[in-house]
């Protein structure tokens, strides 16, 4: 721990995540499953634990049952050594209101800071995908003399309305000159006009300065009690806010390719794209870095199994993540992420999709560019993600980019003849993962083209039984 400072970490995990609906209809945003085996909150807590910060409180509020359960099962620390990951719900400790914002959540939980008596408080969000050594940020914070430090990452200019925007002091690149939360627009960086400096939602504070700022905020009438919207501007106005450049952070086992990976997965499209990042031949974010592991609750399900189906077709998975307990029985999975205990039946196809725990895919069904939440049963011959109007008519969400989303336990009607024919015609779709590989790696284009030709030939053979597939 740098400079022998005592550090308390606070994870803000009370968000509703409206932009991730319907995945957040029954759970808090940080509890949304990710990458087959994890929950979103696992990335924040793993980064803190790997940074050797082992006194962690998680502030929860919205539909927190599954989040609380996950924390209690996955994050058991050695309390005899004074270490803990504690889930703390809104308790109305100050007045009769629940948490009114991220700053108010900490204000209502000031007893946690008083009890721990830290020198430094690290405050992090719970819904981003990245690796970060917070000890390096704390070290800069202490040496800089700032009272508050904000972690910053470069983002495309058209995303300025989604983040807190940081302007650095021209005479001191580690000092914040201005901070605006989610402006309609902002100038680009001098070094790269196509980008701006965005807040990552991760902060380091001198503990006494944070407590004082929270008391000031609590007395104000013109506040939303928000860390980014109110507390950070308070420190900026005092001339006491610093910035930490995320590109300086060095993670053991990382490469230049993945070292500065950071994704806000707060929308359906960004959540989907982050999954597709993982299954590419050379993923931008490497889940397999054992020197900075991402921890989670370990499944008790048996290993995945690939077996022949009833008609002797071979169960296969290509360019995919397949988790414990998955059984692919004569079906084909390509460019997809399958969580625990998914079942894929004979002659079915799962393409460019994300399937969460215990989804069952019936015989001959086709799923394309979809996110399907837990415990959904897809009947035989069903077509999902092939016809947006059909999907909407059945109550599924379809994004503007064409991602179809099914909520937990959502019922999928038995398909009619038109839908069965639609599924049958698309049993040999070429996955986006195959197309992307051809664009990303010219040296494998020939083999990728061969895969595409094989898919096309197989489709033609089914349409004309006398045709030959080579």
Swiss-Prot record:
Domain of life according to the entry: Bacteria
EC identifiers of the protein: 2.7.7.27
Alphabetical UniProt keywords: ATP-binding, Carbohydrate metabolism, Glycogen biosynthesis, Glycogen metabolism, Nucleotide-binding, Nucleotidyltransferase, Transferase
Keyword Flavoprotein attributed: no
Annotated binding of alpha-D-glucose 1-phosphate, by residue: 164, 181-182, 199
UniProt keyword Transferase, yes or no: yes
BP terms from Gene Ontology: glycogen biosynthetic process
Pathway membership: Glycan biosynthesis; glycogen biosynthesis
Gene Ontology MF, one: ATP binding
Catalysis performed (reactions): alpha-D-glucose 1-phosphate + ATP + H(+) = ADP-alpha-D-glucose + diphosphate
Top-level enzyme category: transferase
Entries under Gene3D superfamilies matching the protein: Hexapeptide repeat proteins, Spore Coat Polysaccharide Biosynthesis Protein SpsA, Chain A
Pfam families from the UniProt entry: Hexapep_GlmU, NTP_transferase
PROSITE patterns, alphabetized: ADP_GLC_PYROPHOSPH_2, ADP_GLC_PYROPHOSPH_3
UniProt cross-references to InterPro entries, sorted A to Z: ADP-Glc_PPase, ADP_Glu_pyroP_CS, GlgC_bac, GlmU/GlgC-like_hexapep, NTP_transferase_dom, Nucleotide-diphossugar_trans, Trimer_LpxA-like_sf
Stored HAMAP family: GlgC (MF_00624)
Family per record: Belongs to the bacterial/plant glucose-1-phosphate adenylyltransferase family.
Function: Involved in the biosynthesis of ADP-glucose, a building block required for the elongation reactions to produce glycogen. Catalyzes the reaction between ATP and alpha-D-glucose 1-phosphate (G1P) to produce pyrophosphate and ADP-Glc.
Quaternary structure and partners: Homotetramer.
Listed name of the protein: Glucose-1-phosphate adenylyltransferase
């Amino acid at each position: 721990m740098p400079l022998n400072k005592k550090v308390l970490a606070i994870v803000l995990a009370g968000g509703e995540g409206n932009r991730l609906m319907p995945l957040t209809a029954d759970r808090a945003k940080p509890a949304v499953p990710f990458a087959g085996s994890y929950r979103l909150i696992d990335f924040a807590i793993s980064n803190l634990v790997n940074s050797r910060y082992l006194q962690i409180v998680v502030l929860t509020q919205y539909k927190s049952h599954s989040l609380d359960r996950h924390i209690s099962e996955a994050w058991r620390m050695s309390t005899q050594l004074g270490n803990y990951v504690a889930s703390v719900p809104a308790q109305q400790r100050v007045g009769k209101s629940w948490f009114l914002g991220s700053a108010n959540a900490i204000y209502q939980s000031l007893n946690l800071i008083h009890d721990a008596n830290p020198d430094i408080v690290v405050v992090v969000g719970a819904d981003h995908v990245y690796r970060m050594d917070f000890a390096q940020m704390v070290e800069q914070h202490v040496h800089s003399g700032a009272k508050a430090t904000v972690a910053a990452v470069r983002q495309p200019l058209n995303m300025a309305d989604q983040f807190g925007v940081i302007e650095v002091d021209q005479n001191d690149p580690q000092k914040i000159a201005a901070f605006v939360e989610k402006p309609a627009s902002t100038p680009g960086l001098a070094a790269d006009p196509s980008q701006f400096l965005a807040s990552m939602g991760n902060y380091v504070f001198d503990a006494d300065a944070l407590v004082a700022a929270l008391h000031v905020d609590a007395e104000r009438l013109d506040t939303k009690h928000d860390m980014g919207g109110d507390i950070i501007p308070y420190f900026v106005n005092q001339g006491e806010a610093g910035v930490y450049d995320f590109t300086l952070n060095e993670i053991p086992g990382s490469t230049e390719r993945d070292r500065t990976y950071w994704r806000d997965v707060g929308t359906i499209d960004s959540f989907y794209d982050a999954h597709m990042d993982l299954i590419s031949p050379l993923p931008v974010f490497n889940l397999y870095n054992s020197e900075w592991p991402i921890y989670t609750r370990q499944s008790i399900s048996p290993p995945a199994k690939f077996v022949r189906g009833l008609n002797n077709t071979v169960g296969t998975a290509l360019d995919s993540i397949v988790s414990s307990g998955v059984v692919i029985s004569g079906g084909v999975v390509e460019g997809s992420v399958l969580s625990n205990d998914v079942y894929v039946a004979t002659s079915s196809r799962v393409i460019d999709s994300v399937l969460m725990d215990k989804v069952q895919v019936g015989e001959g069904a086709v799923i394309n560019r979809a996110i399907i939440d837990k415990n959904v049963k897809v009947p035989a011959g069903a077509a999902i993600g092939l016809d947006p109007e059909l999907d909407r008519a059945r109550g599924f969400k379809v994004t503007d980019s064409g991602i179809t989303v099914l909520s937990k336990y959502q019922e999928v009607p038995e398909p009619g003849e038109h839908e069965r024919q639609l599924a049958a015609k698309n049993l040999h779709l070429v996955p986006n993962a195959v197309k992307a590989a051809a664009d990303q790696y010219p040296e494998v284009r020939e083999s990728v083209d061969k895969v595409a030709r094989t898919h096309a030939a197989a489709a033609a053979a089914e349409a004309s039984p006398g045709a030959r597939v080579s």
